[in-house]
Amino acid sequence: MSAISARSRHRRHARAGTASLATAALVASGLTAVGTALPALAHDGLVVLAGDFQSELGCPGDWAPDCTATALPQTAQDVHSATFTVPAGDWQFKVAVGGSWDEAYGVEGGADNYQLRLAGEAELRFTFDDATSLTAVEVLGLDEGYGDADAGLVAEPVRQPGSDENFYFVMTDRFADGDPSNNTGEIDGDRLDHGFDPTDKGFYHGGDIAGLHANLDYIEGLGTTAIWLTPSFQNNPVQGEGADASAGYHGYWITDFTQIDPHLGTNAELEALIDDAHSRGIKVYFDIITNHTADIIDYAEGAYDYIDMATSPYRDADGNAFDPGDYAGTDTFPELDAETSFPYTPVVDPAQTDVKVPAWLNDVTLYHNRGDSTWEGESVTFGDFVGLDDLMTEHPTVVEGFIEVYQDWIDLGIDGFRIDTAKHVNMEFWQEWTTEVLDYAHAQGRDEFFMFGEVYDADARLLSPYVRDTDMSSVLDFAYQSAVVNYARGFTAAGLSALFATDDYYTTPTTNAHALPTFLGNHDMGRIGYFLEGSGDERDRSMLAHSLMYLTRGQPVVYHGDEQGFIGQGGDKDARQSLFASEVEQYQQDWTLHGYQIGAQDRYDTDVPLYEHIATLAELRAGNEALATGAQIELHAADGVYAFARVDREEKVEHVVALNNQAAEQTVTFTTLTPGATYTALHGDHAAVTADASGQVTLTVPALAAVVLLADRPVGEPDAPGSISLQPAQGGRLDGVAPVSADIADDVWAETSFAYRLVGAEDWTPLGTAEGDAPRVFHDVSGLPTGTLVEYRAVSVDAAG
C-alpha cells in the first residue's frame, strides 16, 4: 500500500511536439490527496507538526507538541498548512492539536505515526484538515515544463529482439509421418509397451521430425517465420492402466531431457530440420518443461489427495519443520530424508530407479511429494500436475540442473522456448533460470533468443508479473484469446477495447505487449472452429478472427490444422487431429469449416480458403512494418465494429484497420490521426475515403470482414502546444503495482516516456515508454520502504518531434 503526493502541471514546450511534467508520490504513508479533503472546520487550538525531525526544523527537541516553529497556521480555506525544508533521512511524525498529546492524529487519523523517507533535502508543504483529521504532503519546487535535461529521459518504445514472428504451432506426432520405421520408438511389444496405435486418439500416430522436414514448403507457404514444436524429449511411452492408459505422444511426460524421443526421430534429424528451416528464414522453438517429469514416483501410502503445509510441513533430515519458499532463490537448502521429510513417502519401482536423465532427476527428495494439485492456493506450485512428478523448484540443485539442460539445447541451435506450466513454478525459479538461460544465449551470439511462458490466466494483471519480474521475454496472451473469440462470435467490440487497455501492464524499459504471442485456440483448450460453433457463418468468423490476430499487436500463432478448417469436438485429445491420413474414426468423421469431413486422407491443401487467407495476412504483415510492429491506437469500439490505427515510428504513416463482426455491413464515423488525408484500401473491400479537417472519416465495413486503409501522408502534427497532466495526483494513494499515467491530446500519435526518482536524488530510473493518446505505465512500489517520497516525470513527443 502507498500514498501519493503529486501536482499536475501544464506542459511548456522547448520545441513543438515535446512536453514534460513532474509529480511526486509518497509510498505507504496513509497521507491524503491535496485538494480532495472535505470542507474543513475552524480550529482554535495550536496545530503542530510533531515528529523526530522537529529539531532539524528549528525546535529545541523532537516530538514536541507545543513547538511553534513547526506550527501549521490556519489558511483561508480553514485548513492548517505550512512549508518546511526537510533534510534527507527517515522521519516519523503526527499532527498534535492544542499543544499536547491529548489530541493527536497519525495515519488515517489514528495513533500510528506517519512515515517519511527523503533521499535528499526537499521543500514540503504539510496540510492538516480539521474535518477529516487527515494530513497531506506536497512536494514544492518540482521542475516545470520541458528542459534540456528531459531529452535524456526520452526513450523509444520497446520492440524486443526476436518478437516479430508468425508462429506455426505443431504437435509433431500429429503432423506428418516421414519415417514409419520409428513409429514404435524402438520399443518391442504391443501398444501398452511402445504407445503406438494410430486408431486411438490417445496414442502415438506416427508423426515425426522427418515428416516436418519433408513438409517445410507447406509450413513456409503460410508465411510462417517460426515453428513451435510440442515437447520433443524422450517420454514415458505409456502411463495409466486399462481404459485410462494413454501414450506420451504429446511430449509432456519427459524422462530424458537430453534426447529427442525415438518416436519422433533423433537429435541429428532435429539439427537437420533446424538447418533447413534457418535457410528459409524460419526459426525453430522448443516447448519445454521445468515443473514436472513423467509419473515415475509413487506414494507408499497409496493416497494422492493434496496435503497442505499447515497440516504436514516439510521436515529436514533432523526433523525440523521448514518452508521451501524460505530457501527459494538461495544457494542453500536443508538436507532431506525420503522416509521422513514429506507428507507422502516417495517410492519408485526398482526397474525405473535410473530412468530419468540427467541423473539428478532420480533423487526423489527433489520433488514436492504432496499429492495432486487442487489448482488453488499453495497447491498451484506444490501439487502434482495430475499425478506427474512435481519438482522441488525451490531447490538450487533443480534450478542449476535445468539451467544446464536448456543451455545445452541452445547449443544445438534452438531459437527459443515456449515454457510449459509456468504458473505452477515458484517465481524465484524463473527469476534465476530465465536470467541465466537468456544471458547464455546472448553470450553465444543468439541476440534474438526469445522465451515465452504458459500462464493459464486471462488477466494481464496475473500474466504480466512473469514478464515484469523475470527475464522471461513474454507470455502466451490468454487474455487475448478469450477476448478475440468473444468478438469473433459476435459480441460487442468493447471487449477488445478493454483487452488492449491493459497492454500497459507489460510496458517496462525492456518489455512491451507487442511481444505477446497471440492465439485463437490450442491443443489443450480446443480449436477456434470449435469455439465458434453455433455462431453462424463459422468459416467467415474464423477468417475474421485470424484477420484480427494478424493485424493487431503481438505475434500470431496458428495451431496446426486450423488452416485446414479443423473444428474438433472439444479440448485435449478432441483437438489433436493429424494432417496426415487419420485412422481414428472420430477424427475421420470430424467436420471442417470448409464444409466437408476430414476423412481418411492427407490434409495439406494449400488452396482452401483458410490456408489462403492466413497466407495473405502473413504477406500483408510482412510487407507493411506498421502492421507488424507499429504502435496500435484505438479509434473506434462500438457494437460490432472495432477500428484502430497502426503507425510505424519511422515512416509515421497511418494504417487504419477496421473489423466488423456482424452479418451485415456497418457504417461508422470516427476520428483518425491524420486530418485531411486520403485513405486507400490496402486490404479488403473499401473505396478511397478522405478525412475532414478534424480527421473524421466515415467507413462502411463489410460483413464479417476486415479492411486496411493507408493514408497518403504522415500523421498530423498539433496546430499549437497543448497541455499535459500527470497522475497520480498530489497525495493520492497507490498500492503494489501502481498506475502512472499522462493525459495528453486525443487522437494523436505520441510516445510518452515515464521515469521516477526518489525525491532529493539526482538520477532518474525509466519506467517505460507508452504509445498513443492514453499513455500509462505501472510502477511496482512494493519494494520501496514505507514513507519513501518518489518523484515521477513524463516526457511526451508527438509527430512534430
Regions found by a protein language model. Give the residues of each.
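Substrate-binding/active-site clefts of carbohydrate-active enzymes
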Residues: R159-N166, D173-L412, W433-Q444, F450-G453, ...
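Aromatic-rich carbohydrate-binding modules that target alpha-glucans
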Residues: H43-D90, G98-R117, T769-A770
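Carbohydrate-interacting/catalytic domains
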Residues: S2-S5, A25-S29, P39-A42, L46, ...
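Hydrophobic beta-strand segments within extracellular beta-sandwich modules
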Residues: F93, V790-Y792
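Surface-exposed, short loops/turns at beta-strand junctions within beta-sandwich domains
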Residues: V86-P87, V781-L789
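Conserved structural position at the C-terminal beta-strand
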Residues: V97, A794-S796
